[in-house]
Amino acid sequence: MAARSAPSCHLRLEWVYGYRGHQCRNNLYYTAAKEIVYFVAGVGVVYSPREHRQKFFRGHSDDIISLALHPERVLVATGQVGKEPYICVWDSYTVQTVSVLKDVHTHGIACLAFDLDGQRLVSVGLDSKNAVCVWDWKRGRMLSMAPGHTDRIFDISWDLYQPNKLVSCGVKHIKFWSLCGNALTPKRGVFGKTGDLQTILCLACARDELTYSGALNGDIYVWKGINLIRTIQGAHTAGIFSMNSCEEGFATGGRDGCIRLWDLTFKPITVIDLRETEQGYKGLSVRSVCWRGDHILVGTQDSEIFEIVVHERNKPFLIMQGHCEGELWALAVHPTKPLAVTGSDDRSVRIWSLVDHALIARCNMEEPIRCAAVNVDGIHLALGMKDGSFTVLRVRDMTEVVHIKDRKEAIHELKYSPDGAYLAVGCNDSSVDIYGVAQRYKKVGECVGSLSFITHLDWSSDSRYLQTNDGSGKRLLYKMPGGKEVTSKEEIKGMHWASWTCVAGLEVNGIWPKYSDINDINSVDGNYVGQVLVTADDYGVVKLFRYPCLRKGAKFRKYIGHSAHVTNVRWSHDYQWVISIGGADHSVFQWKFIPERKLKDALHIAPQESLAESNSDESDSDLSDVPELDSEIEQETQLTYHRQVYKEDLPQLKEQCKEKQKSATSKRRERTPGTSIRLHFIHGYRGYDCRSNLFYTQIGEIVYHVAAVGVIYNRQQNTQRFYLGHDDDILCLAIHPLKDYVATGQVGRDPSIHVWDTETIKPLSILKGYHQYGICAVDFSADGKRLASVGIDDSHTIVLWDWKKGEKLSVTRGSKDKIFVVKMNPYVPDKLITAGIKHMKFWRRAGGGLIGKKGYVGTLGKNDTMMCAVYGWTEEMAFSGTSTGDVCIWRDVFLVKTVKAHDGPVFSMHALEKGFVTGGKDGMVALWDDSFERCLKTYAIKRADLAPGSKGLLLEDNPSIRAISLGHGHILVGTKNGEILEVDKSGPITLLVQGHMEGEVWGLATHPYLPICATVSDDKTLRIWDLSPSHCMLAVRKLKKGGRCCCFSPDGKALAVGLNDGSFLMANADTLEDLVSFHHRKDIISDIRFSPGSGKYLAVASHDSFVDIYNVTSSKRVGVCKGATSYITHIDWDSRGKLLQVNTGAKEQLFFEAPRGKRQTIPSVEVEKISWATWTSVLGLCCEGIWPVIGEVTEVTASCLTSDKMVLATGDDLGFVKLFRYPAKGKFGKFKKYVAHSTHVTNVRWTYDDSMLVTLGGADMSLMVWTNEVESHREKKYCDSEESDIDSEEDGGYDSDVTRENEISYTIRALSTNIRPMFGVKPHLQQKEPSVDERQGVVRGSRPPVSRAPPQPEKLQSNNVGKKKRPIEDLVLELAFGYRGRDCRNNVHYLNDGDDIIYHTASIGILHNVATGTQSFYQEHNDDILCLTVNQHPKFINIVATGQVGDSADMSATAPSVHIWDAVNKQTLSILRCSHSKGVCSVSFSATGKLLLSVGLDPEHTVTIWRWQEGAKIASRGGHNQRIFVAEFRPDSDTQFVSVGIKHVKFWTLAGRALLSKKGLLSSLEDARMQTMLAVAFGANNLTFTGTISGDVCVWKDHILCRVVARAHNGPVFAMYTTLRDGLIVTGGKERPSKEGGAVKLWDQELRRCRAFRLETGQVTDCVRSVCRGKGKILVGTRNSEIIEVGEKNAACNILVNGHVDGPIWGLATHPSRDFFLSAAEDGTVRLWDIADKKMLNKVNLGHAARTVCYSPEGDMVAIGMKNGEFIILLVSSLKIWGKKRDRRCAIHDIRFSPDSRYLAVGSSENSVDFYDLTLGPTLNRISYCKDIPSFVIQMDFSADSRHLQVSSGCYKRHVYEVPSGKHLVDHAAIDRITWATWTSILGDEVMGIWSRHAEKADVTCACVSHSGISLVTGDDFGMVKLYDFPCPEKFAKHKRFLGHSPHVTNIRFTSGDRHVVSAGGDDCSLFVWKCVHMPH
């Protein structure tokens, strides 16, 4: 028997030879204790050079590849590779885990770094995006994450001198990051001309924004900010792998084998060339360097660690060596000394001293070494090579004895015979050669039986036999030395083996798992003395088994540390140690063997010894000596709780089915029924698969659960209250230490835990996101702040929560076996225990993870299954109850004793003040003293002891006890049979509540005239229940078989019951005694019915597809109804008792005539006319509407019609009880729905007077009683929810503005494309025309300084001659004319008591001073702002949040985000990147100002709540499938908010981290319909007001509509504002101005009275988009981009801001001498703006869209070109039309006066330019035009002498024409000599440099050269304004860029004197005025 249990001895890791130098850098440091920390394989090593001792950190599961040291130098962070890699932060002193960071990275963790104070840790992943992640490591929480780079990142560091800044570097890049909120934003380092773009390998940050970095070519690059400022060339001659900074300066180490020390300013101090030292060698490469004081640590590529003392730097000290890169396979031990020999593919053979832990000899061979052996006398060492040769060396001086090559393939194994005479050599070519040692290794034999390569060899003790294993897993035996194969069984029996290293053979059967045929065990070695066997496998595991182990699947102890395959393992000669070697990690592990007798002492000496690793999970999957599992527990472990369809899947399923319904719902459907039901009482308690789920609350009520309901039972009044927040089975329940809150966990795909208040029955927090399938155990901590939960997924995940915040603190995989219970340590909140199938585990928290140890049973017992557990009186005492009836007592992790407590499992135990109480399967309750020494008292649960006041009857004596709890002088007991009992201390037992036992319940019947009902179940009982207030079970009877249906006779005296074996019986309804029984069918009887009236006939339906009709009086079968093709599900009689209606499983609705059973066909129209005695059918036209949209996945199982035939109740497979109006014609009827049952509802019945509805849950075994509440109009009781499966088909209303806003698609700046339909080759890709110089063959720069040729004329006429020309070096935004009102709302607010207003346009936030008109800007957004809100809390004064558009959801810089900033100083306080796509359309601060709500534009319209100061996302959930316009917090709340949108209003609550929502309920008002809602405001007492598309305002109380303010406005109500100080409400709508109405209204707090304000804008319709109220003023933003201030007293309007209504603004012209400019736009207006006065001076409505505008040279005339081809000339003085003309049919793109004012040039999209002579007067006759323009005209410029015109066209070509003839000029020399009056062309060699590399899809759209002729500004499709020098003929010229506009800058101009630049926006309809900053003289 013992052979299959794990051995009781133990291995302890003592030493690791090696250091990981390959593929890793910067992984070697000094700790504060002057120890050295590094890693190798999967082990972190702390080495003390003083004591020559190693400590090990073994918390990783795979190769460690990165390491960082905390600034205090005690803590270490390490990162590993793997599919789900994690980071451990651990203490280098205790080598215990402090925190585990996981669930974010994939592939591996490449770099780690702590910040200055060590609070945060940054990590970089190995995934394709090289994700960068910042952690709050103590809490195990991720703060921020962003894609790092498209290529590998090699190093990352925090800037230790600037907070929240990091630097990362890698392949061909360096990035400078800033962290703000949850946003990590990178800026790429600019290499510029200073150095080549190349790979940066390491970096260090210094003061003054300096960063030093080491490059691949050996240079050091020095950065200031993001720019490269200098390089230190040749710092190393090859790549610099490591850079370390310390107080004295910097140390660098490189591939050239040198260490360089630098001072703090990076001036060189010294060089140490390790290759030149005595330990050095050619090719030495430094991977890691650490400089501390006078010591330097160096790690090399070849796994050495050197320590250098600075003043003796030529004498480095070698403190660690290991094998270099290359697989390590060869291992042998010396036969007499404590030495081990290893040989590797690095071609070295090394000898290690196991005592001194040191390398004592090394020899390099010619070939890679694959195996080794030492002869018995220890003199010869044989090495087998990869090339098929073998070499023999003398051990003492490593000289060669012989080298033999007989084979061509690798030698895998060789062994000397025990007598030393022979050497056996096994090869890859399947042969074994035998050599004679004495004959100088002459070949004496050969074994050729194998068909595959040889893997292992062993000699027999007498050296006469050899056994081999080969690659196919075969074991063969040979006679020695000849090599004849041995097959005789007799001969084999007698062999004794000198060693056992074979993996195949009887003795080692047990090392293989039971059902596997894989060969992943690489090596074994038997220890005959200790009777143990050690194995090495491909998964990095070393295992100990008993030896011999004969039976497959033996138990073992396992040890991890190696990363991948362990290639070989051997005992040392005296069995003191085990040596194991790793193939890929090329490390050598030395383990100390601790025999059984020393185990106890050993455990106490070594604290870092974690037993969890040794006594592994797999090693005890099925110990043979564990007793059989108890039947009850076995049944329970087989429950899966999987669902075909989870409730979470319903929304998606509905979406998928949406298509089918479109057609179905065109008909107007019935409203929901007028009645509602309310859950009244539940008969049932879930005891059969749950434990300890029954408690007393603070006030003595009893809390438990059944189905999906949390029940609070009041035993005085016999009433129940219900928590109905769950939507599926509750599996566990725990009570808060104060006994007022309860936590319940449910089944689900992503199951949730609800923490709720037993008094108010409101949820306090909902926890989800970390479990799967369900939650089987929960427990509160002693302080009540934390909660532990266990899931039922395969690894039984354990999660620790801060439940109030809803935050996960830690998570870990619990165990492969089922966990039954979790308990938190009442004394140490970071500790907990879990217990379950064959295990007890003790856990402690470590950051985001938990570290577990298995309970250590020792010799006291065996690993039993634990059913319950509690903590005792000190933190290390724990008690657990087992499946065999014992109680185990634990101290720390050790079992100290067991006490027999019950017969059969102990299911529940509870700690009391002075002792314990236990309950078991034997039906006994036992009270114990405080040390479990003696049992004080036992109570048996027996029928005899039932007290008279019991509410029901005990089914049997001694039911299995599943839950037990004490309080109020009583013991509360819950049984497996579904009973809840109260045991008085003196003995009497009161039964309080009961239900059916395990087994489905289907049969239900209500009595014809009494409030009682009968149920029958698969639990083989028939029960009668009292539905009157006594709520008890009146009678019960056991049946021989389970039953599925029952029915009372019409007189109520008899009860018919159908059983599952095809029989049925009739019983006396009072005594339940048999009257008569029949057995005519084989299958289940599914329905049974007495005919109405006298009850003469009984119809019995079965799954045999027949209905039998019996005559009751004669007890004879009189008819059979045949013809059904499937089993019968429901039957009903008509009221005459003549006709039967039948439903079948094939969805047939059939009719039969009684009593003979003849089938009738009845047209569906007629069916309605028939009067039915009962209706329980689910088929037919009358109930078509009860089938849901997702009918494929769910069946309607039951229905029942009220006697007044008004309301049909149904039950379905998803546990919903629904009420429909009858008849429910038309598909997908509207209904009221109730969730309480968990899975299928099997039956529903109204009582005889319709006062109650009784429903049965199939699998939840509960009988629920609901009261019918017919609503009166005064008293509105609302139901759980009122819905239909699809959105109401009624139209939500129509309005053009709403439709536009809903359908708008926002362009992302980065994805912007051409605004003009350009075609052709871009200028920077065209073949360049040669210049004059080039044509003349002049080499550039070689033209003589003095030349006879006339000087080239100026390109541009300079207008400000006389002044020195000063180039412009910067542009500063000074004014923005524009406001985004067209598709945003509530985005204008007062600040500073109404002195300033804040609003936005394009991507800038604008603070505008009301008195002076001055503006300041927030310019940190990188794309359009869509929403803005102001924090109202006095603590957060002037704090603004703005949300922007974005594309991706990968959290990179282009993701949608919210910025929170200070409006006064424009400081960004936080950036919140959203993980959804498209953009953020609404933001709102909570009452305390600490939370922010944001709504996304993604298809789900995600609603997210943030703690904005930390950048933490608290909760997030899809809001609605259609557009949400606004969501706002209630002004007095941090948890309630309301969202409104297209046909949508939802009332939300934040509970912990979960968002719960309720739809607005309309049914309370007769003809209310769900309209599109546009705005929201709030009143006291939970009142909410929503503005609708029709102009009504809806008033809601909680979530129920209570009144409608009809026509509050005549058009949509777009904006509402709640004034906090007085509660008054402002509304803004869209309406035509009228006498009494107005687009803005001010209302009282209840929205009963109002005052209207008219906006005197002169518009036909005013459309208000934003309202805000200050002191005596109302601030209004309109659709027409005006911001108006209205006085409350005098109603006077003051327009503060004007802007164009619609864009693009194509036309822009600046006045020739004054600071004025004109703009012309698609909205049909031309506007005149004054820069000095900061306002619009005038506007002209043209009635058509305008495209271009131009001043005459004197500034007295204006020419305007229209979109329809017309152009107009106005006189500036009077704005009168001087002339107009329309010679073209399509848009005029540019219009220009010639500099001499004589000609007007008009360029159009008809590929033409027309010339008009203005001297001929206002008739405007065309004098000529330019032909042959290949595409539409974009821009035109006149020459200074008015004789030429340059034209840019839509095919990227520039042409020059003569004026006025229109002749095309092609002579390049002539063109080069023209001086231009203006330059606005985007084409031409002079502006080649403005075209950027990144313009595949987007273009430069406009340009303008300054009047001084030396600066150039451009605008482009990306919305950027760029400043260049002019001319800029070089491609990709240097420039400065200025953001602010939305995509498409349409025009740009300098004002006179180059004082300002004006830019016009396309998408944003805004005009920006930039101040020019000139370079000083």
Curated annotation (Swiss-Prot):
Keywords for the protein's UniProt record, in alphabetical order: Cytoplasm, Cytoskeleton, Microtubule, Repeat, WD repeat
The keyword Repeat is annotated on this UniProt entry: yes
SMART domains per the UniProt record, alphabetical: WD40
Comp. bias regions, Basic and acidic residues: 1326-1337
UniProt region (Disordered), positions on chain: 609-629, 1276-1297, 1323-1363
Localization terms from the record: Cytoplasm, Cytoskeleton
Cited InterPro entries: Beta-prop_EML-like_2nd, Beta-prop_EML_1st, HELP, Quinoprotein_ADH-like_sf, WD40/YVTN_repeat-like_dom_sf, WD40_repeat_CS, WD40_repeat_dom_sf, WD40_rpt
SUPFAM superfamilies in alphabetical order: Quinoprotein alcohol dehydrogenase-like, TolB, C-terminal domain, WD40 repeat-like
Biased composition (Acidic residues): 615-629, 1281-1294
Residues in WD repeats: 59-100, 104-145, 148-187, 195-233, 235-273, 280-321, 323-362, 406-445, 449-488, 561-601, 725-766, 770-811, 814-853, 861-900, 901-940, 996-1035, 1038-1077, 1080-1120, 1236-1276, 1420-1471, 1475-1516, 1519-1558, 1568-1606, 1608-1654, 1699-1739, 1741-1782, 1783-1822, 1895-1934, 1940-1977
GO cellular component, one term: cytoplasm
Domain of life: Eukaryota
Function: May modify the assembly dynamics of microtubules, such that microtubules are slightly longer, but more dynamic.
Stated family: Belongs to the WD repeat EMAP family.
Protein name: Echinoderm microtubule-associated protein-like 5
UniProt lineage: Eukaryota, Metazoa, Chordata, Craniata, Vertebrata
